[in-house]
C-alpha cells in the first residue's frame, strides 16, 4: 500500500500468498495442496483490496474528508470486493474453464503449489528456485541497492518529432510475457509502436515546445496528458466488445448453475465443477447491495441537500456501483487472463468508471441545481470518487479472483470453497484498510493534503492514480476535460475490433488481434510493456525450436520447464518487492531515507542502464538454457 501511494506501483498478491502459505503449512503434518490453495486464495483477496488507494485518497486531497472513516472505508472495500467475487462466478466457466487465456500468475501459483506438494517434485522446486533467486537478486540490485536501472530508452529526434525505443528490465514481466504467449505479445507491441512510433512523434512535431523543456520531457508530457487517454478509449470500447462476446458463454454458465440448483444429473458428480449456488449468490448479492446502500446513505447524509435528492443519489449511485461493477469485473478478469494481474491496467478501468459516474451525476447536478454552488460541485466530485472506490475494489478483486480460480482449476480445488474463502478474505482485508491508510496519511500526508501544518510537503505520498482520478472528475464537473483523445481511442478501438474480426474469419480463428492488449500497450509505461513483449517472443522462439525436433515428450518437458522458470521469476521479484517495501517503510517511519539500501553512486545513471541491459540479456540466455535442457533429459 505504501509503494502504491508513493510511486503508483502495486504487485499481485496471489504468488507471494502461495509461497508464504506453502512455507507455513510445511510445518504442519499432512498438509495438502488444497489447504495451501485455500490459504493462498483467501490471503490474496485480502491483499488485493489495497488497490482502493487508486481512488479513495482523492477525497482527502480535494479537502472533502479530513481522515478515513473506519466504517465507511471498511464497508465500501468489503462490498466492492464481494461484488468482484460474485460477478466472476458466472465468468469462471467462460474465462477459465472453456478459455485459452493464459492467466500467468494463476499458472505460476499452481506450479508453486504443485512443486511444494510432491516429495518427488525436486526438479520443479529447483526450476522455481533458480528463477526466484535470479529475479530476486536483480530486483534487489534495481530497487534495493539501486545500482541497476529498471529500464532504458533510446530517443531519436527528427526535426521536432521525438521517437522512443524503450526497454524495461523486469525479469518478472519477462516471465509473465513467456506465459502470455505470442498473440498477446504482438498486440502489445502494436500498441507500443502506435504510441512511441506514431502518436507521440506526431504530437511533439505539431506542437510548440516550451523554451525551458527538453524534447524528451515534452514527449513524456504528451504521452501522459494525451496519448494515454487514447489508450483509455481503446481499452473502454474493447472491454465493451469483450463483454458482448462473453455474454453467451456467461449466460450458459448461469444456466448450468441453475440446473445444478434444481438437482440435475450434474449436481454432485464433479467436485471441481461446482460453484456457489445461484440461490446463495442472490442472498449474498442482496446483503452486499444493502451494505452499499448503507455506506452511500451515510456519505450523502452529510451533504446539505433535500431528503428526496438524497434518496435519488443513493439509488442512482448504488445502481452505478453494481452495473459498472459487473462490466469492469468482466473486463478486468479478461485483461488479467490475457496479460496477467501485474500488467492489467486497473487505473485505466478506474478512469472509465470515474468518467461514466461523473457524466451521470452531471445530469443530476444540472437538474437539481447542485451545480449552482461551489460546494455542490465539490460534493458531486466527492460522491463520484466514493462510488468509484466501490467499483475499483470490484475490478481489483475480479482481476485477482480469476487468477486464483485458474490456480484452483490446475490443482483440482473446489470452486465454491474458493469463492467462500475469497469473500472471507475481502472482509478480513477490509478491516485493516482504513487503519493502515490512516497511519500512512498521518505519517506522511498526501500531495495537497497534509494533516499537520509543520509537515514537509516533499515527504508527502503522491498517490498518482488518486490524483489523476480526482483531476478527471473535477475536469468533467468544471467542463474542462479534453474529450478528443478518449474519443480518438474509441475510434481506434473500433477499427482494431474490425481487423480482429476479419483475421478470425479469414484464418478460421487461427489468427487474432486482442484489442484490449493493444490498448494496454498504449496506456502502460513502456518499461512495463517491453519485457512482457520480449517474454512472449522468447516463448514463441523456444516453441518453434523445440518443435523442429519432432519429439512430443521433449516439447512437453520444455513447456513445463519454461512455465516453472517463469513462475520462479514472478515469485522472486514479487517476494523481493514485499521485503523491500517493509525495509523502506521501517526506514521512513523512523525518520530515515526512502532508499535506505541505495549505494548512491555518483555519475552512475548511464552505467546503471548498461548494467541493467546486460543483466537482462543474461537473464534471457539463462531462461532459454533452462528450457532447452529438455533436449538433454
From Swiss-Prot:
Gene Ontology molecular function: oligopeptide transmembrane transporter activity
Keyword vocabulary terms for this entry: Cell membrane, Membrane, Peptide transport, Protein transport, Transmembrane, Transmembrane helix, Transport
InterPro entries: Oligopep_transpt (IPR004814), OPT (IPR004813), YSL-like (IPR045035)
One annotated GO biological process: protein transport
Segments passing through the bilayer: 8-28, 45-65, 70-90, 128-148, 180-200, 230-250, 281-301, 311-331, 345-365, 379-399, 420-440, 483-503, 515-535, 564-584, 604-624
Source species, domain of life: Bacteria
Subcellular location: Cell membrane
Organism expressing this protein natively: Haemophilus influenzae (strain ATCC 51907 / DSM 11121 / KW20 / Rd)
Name used for this protein in its record: Putative oligopeptide transporter HI_0561
Family statement: Belongs to the oligopeptide OPT transporter family.
One Gene Ontology term, aspect cellular component: plasma membrane
Membrane-protein topology: Multi-pass membrane protein
Pfam (any one): OPT
UniProt main location, coarse: membrane
S-S bonds: none
Amino acid at each position: 500500500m505504501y509503494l502504491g501511494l508513493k510511486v503508483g506501483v502495486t504487485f499481485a498478491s496471489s504468488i507471494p500468498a502461495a509461497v508464504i502459505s506453502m512455507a507455513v503449512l510445511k510445518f504442519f503434518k499432512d498438509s495438502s495442496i488444497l489447504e495451501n490453495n485455500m490459504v493462498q486464495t483467501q490471503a490474496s483477496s485480502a491483499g488485493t483490496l489495497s488497490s482502493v488507494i487508486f481512488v479513495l485518497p482523492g477525497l482527502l486531497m480535494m479537502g472533502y474528508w479530513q481522515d478515513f472513516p473506519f466504517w465507511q472505508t471498511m464497508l465500501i472495500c468489503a462490498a466492492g470486493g464481494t461484488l468482484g467475487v460474485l460477478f466472476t462466478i458466472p465468468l469462471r466457466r467462460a474465462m477459465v474453464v472453456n478459455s485459452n487465456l493464459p492467466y500467468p500468475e494463476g499458472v505460476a501459483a499452481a506450479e508453486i503449489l504443485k512443486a511444494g506438494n510432491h516429495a518427488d517434485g525436486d526438479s520443479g522446486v529447483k526450476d522455481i528456485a533458480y528463477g526466484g533467486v535470479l529475479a530476486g537478486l536483480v530486483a534487489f540490485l534495481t530497487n534495493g541497492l539501486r545500482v541497476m536501472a529498471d529500464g532504458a530508452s533510446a530517443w531519436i529526434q527528427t526535426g521536432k518529432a521525438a521517437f522512443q525505443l524503450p526497454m524495461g528490465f523486469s525479469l518478472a514481466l519477462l516471465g509473465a510475457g513467456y506465459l502470455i504467449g505470442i498473440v498477446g505479445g504482438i498486440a502489445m507491441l502494436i500498441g507500443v509502436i502506435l504510441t512511441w512510433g506514431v502518436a507521440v512523434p506526431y504530437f511533439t512535431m505539431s506542437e510548440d515546445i516550451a523554451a525551458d523543456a527538453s524534447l524528451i520531457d515534452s514527449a513524456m508530457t504528451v504521452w501522459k496528458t494525451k496519448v494515454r487517454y487514447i489508450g483509455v478509449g481503446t481499452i473502454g470500447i474493447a472491454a465493451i466488445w469483450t463483454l458482448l462476446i462473453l455474454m453467451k458463454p456467461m449466460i450458459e454458465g448461469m444456466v448450468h448453475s441453475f440446473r445444478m440448483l434444481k438437482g440435475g444429473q450434474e449436481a454432485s458428480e464433479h467436485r471441481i465443477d461446482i460453484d456457489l449456488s445461484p440461490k446463495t449468490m442472490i442472498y449474498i448479492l442482496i446483503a452486499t447491495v444493502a451494505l452499499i446502500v448503507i455506506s452511500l446513505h451515510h456519505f450523502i447524509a452529510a451533504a446539505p441537500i433535500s431528503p428526496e435528492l438524497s434518496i435519488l443519489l443513493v439509488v442512482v449511485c448504488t445502481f452505478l456501483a453494481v452495473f459498472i461493477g459487473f462490466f469492469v469485473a468482466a473486463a478486468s478478469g479478461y485483461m488479467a487472463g490475457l496479460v496477467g494481474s501485474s500488467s492489467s491496467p486497473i487505473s485505466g478501468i478506474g478512469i472509465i468508471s470515474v468518467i461514466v459516474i461523473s457524466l451521470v451525476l452531471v445530469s443530476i447536478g444540472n437538474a437539481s441545481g447542485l451545480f449552482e454552488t461551489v460546494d455542490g460541485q465539490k460534493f458531486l466530485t466527492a460522491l463520484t470518487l466514493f462510488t468509484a472506490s466501490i467499483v475499483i475494489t470490484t475490478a481489483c478483486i475480479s482481476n485477482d479472483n480469476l487468477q486464483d480460480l485458474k490456480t484452483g482449476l490446475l490443482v483440482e480445488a473446489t470452486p465454491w470453497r474458493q469463492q467462500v474463502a475469497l469473500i472471507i478474505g475481502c472482509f478480513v482485508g477490509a478491516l485493516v484498510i482504513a487503519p493502515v491508510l490512516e497511519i500512512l496519511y498521518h505519517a506522511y500526508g498526501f500531495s495537497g493534503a497534509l494533516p499537520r501544518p509543520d509537515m514537509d510537503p516533499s515527504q508527502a505520498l503522491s498517490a498518482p492514480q488518486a490524483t489523476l482520478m480526482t483531476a478527471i472528475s473535477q475536469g468533467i464537473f468544471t467542463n474542462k476535460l479534453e474529450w478528443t483523445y478518449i474519443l480518438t481511442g474509441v475510434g481506434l478501438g473500433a477499427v482494431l475490433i474490425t481487423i480482429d474480426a476479419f483475421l478470425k474469419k479469414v484464418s478460421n480463428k487461427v489468427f487474432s488481434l486482442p484489442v484490449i492488449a493493444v490498448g494496454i500497450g498504449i496506456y502502460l509505461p513502456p518499461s512495463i510493456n517491453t519485457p512482457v513483449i520480449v517474454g512472449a517472443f522468447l516463448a514463441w522462439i523456444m516453441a518453434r525450436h523445440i518443435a523442429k525436433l519432432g519429439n512430443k515428450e521433449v516439447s512437453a518437458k520444455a513447456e513445463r520447464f519454461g512455465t516453472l522458470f517463469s513462475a520462479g521469476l514472478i515469485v522472486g521479484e514479487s517476494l523481493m518487492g514485499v521485503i523491500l517495501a517493509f525495509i523502506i517503510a521501517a526506514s521512513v517511519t523512523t525518520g530515515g531515507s526512502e532508499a535506505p539500501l541505495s549505494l548512491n553512486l555518483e555519475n552512475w545513471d548511464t552505467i546503471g542502464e548498461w548494467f541493467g541491459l546486460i543483466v537482462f540479456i543474461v537473464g534471457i540466455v539463462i531462461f532459454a538454457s533452462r528450457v532447452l535442457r529438455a533436449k538433454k533429459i
